[in-house]
Regions:
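Residues within membrane-spanning alpha-helices of integral membrane proteins
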Residues: 3, 35, 41, 68-72, ...
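Hydrophobic alpha-helical segments with transmembrane-like composition
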Residues: 82, 99-158, 178-182, 196
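Specific transmembrane helices
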Residues: 43, 47, 65-91, 259, ...
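Alpha-helical transmembrane segments in multi-pass integral membrane proteins
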Residues: 4-28, 46-58, 84, 104-106, ...
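Short hydrophobic, aromatic-rich alpha-helical segments embedded in or entering the lipid bilayer
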Residues: 90-99, 293, 298
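Residue-level signature of the transmembrane alpha-helical core
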Residues: 68, 72, 76, 126, ...
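Extended basic-aromatic, gly/pro-enriched interface segments that bind polyanionic ligands
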Residues: 30, 36
Length: 353
């Protein structure tokens, strides 16, 4: 769901949907579904984590094979086929391959600007075991308090002088570093701890009534996106926000994320997420996300549509279909065969024997 929503906001931008219109304001903030992805990632990883040395080896092994093969495959193909990436310096290539491009000024390569979020996600993978180790002897209730405190502190990230003064010459945009988005991860971390509290109290299978009306929470989520897309709330489009505007943007994303994520985490009623096609989309969502920008960059010239000149209703379904097909290929040819070290070894043996 998050991958499709992020694709939609990119299509809306590239086809010139007016961000000052009501629908444009909402579509422009569909990037808040990234917050849902961050929260879901934190929720799944935190609740399944056992913080001892043996588990850490398994944890990092799984994270590497889950993320890196598909990412490297996309970067290599994009470097070879996306014109905007031609002539990239070795520094840019190596930083992109190592998830460190956000730490370089002008570090983004054409067709790969969306990968910044994976740089943030990789830092979370590194930070999470440290956080778990520090809180290993603390109960769920106190962990929730810690996460709430850290989330509040993270809202001050953009106000730090060194961050507020970026980006500038030879300095990257530090607003998009991991601390700036901890609130979004905190939603998932807190949800995991609340789940543990419910398990200990024997009410794990009892739905949380406040979340039974999911449609109402969706309305709040859409209102949060609409509000964040208004000029009085902060700049629209690619204009760099001030520290206060960035903090407001993160808060709105946190509200939207909680409204979308929590009703499904704490109320197990049937939903559209149970449909087979949605389950399959979830399976290929990583490759779908990786490749959708390249697909969009191909669809526009094939249709003879110049950027920012319209065609949203034509470009959107074609970009979805193309991303679905390429994402499926990425999953079948890269993600699944290279899902673990053992699987990768067997795959390479089949290829080169």
């Amino acid at each position: 769901m998050s991958a499709v929503a992020i694709m939609t906001t990119h299509v809306a931008f590239q086809t010139g949907i007016d961000p000052h219109s009501h629908i444009g304001a909402i579509l422009g903030r569909f990037d808040y579904f990234l917050a849902v992805f961050f929260a879901f990632s934190a929720y799944l990883l935190w609740r399944g984590m056992d913080f001892h040395r043996g588990m850490l080896v398994t944890y990092f092994h799984r994270r590497f094979w889950r993320v890196v093969p598909g990412y490297w495959a996309y970067v290599v193909v994009a470097l070879a086929l996306v014109p905007e990436a031609f002539g990239a310096s070795w520094v840019s290539v190596l930083s992109t391959l190592s998830f460190t491009q956000i730490y370089l000024p002008e570090g983004f390569l054409g067709g790969m600007t969306h990968l910044w979020s994976l740089c943030v996600e990789v830092v979370f993978y590194l930070v999470m075991p440290l956080l778990g180790w520090a809180l290993r002897n603390v109960g769920p209730a106190k962990r929730i308090m810690v996460f709430c405190g850290l989330a509040l502190l993270s809202l001050g990230w953009a106000f730090l002088p060194v961050v507020a003064d970026s980006p500038r010459e030879h300095v990257p945009n530090m607003q998009i570093f991991f601390p700036g988005f901890f609130c979004w991860y905190a939603v998932g971390l807190i949800a995991a701890e609340v789940e543990e509290l419910r398990r200990r109290r024997g009410v794990m299978d009892k739905p949380v009534k406040v979340f039974q009306y999911r449609w109402a929470w969706w309305l709040v989520a859409f209102f949060a996106m609409w509000l964040a897309g208004q000029e009085f709330f902060g700049p629209v489009g690619l204009e760099h926000p001030s520290a206060g505007e960035f903090a407001l943007r993160v808060i709105a994303g946190t509200v939207m994320c909680a409204c979308v994520f929590l009703p499904y985490a704490f109320h197990s009623a049937p939903s559209f997420l149970d449909w087979r096609i949605i389950s399959y989309l979830g399976r290929i969502s990583y490759s779908f996300f990786l490749w959708h920008l390249a697909v969009l960059g191909t669809v526009l010239p094939l249709l003879g549509i110049r950027p920012f000149t319209g065609g949203f209703l034509v470009v959107l379904p074609l970009t979805f279909i193309g991303s679905f097909i390429v994402g499926s290929c990425g999953y079948v040819l890269v993600e699944w065969p290279f899902r673990s070290a053992r699987a990768a070894k067997l795959t390479l043996l089949r290829i080169f024997r």
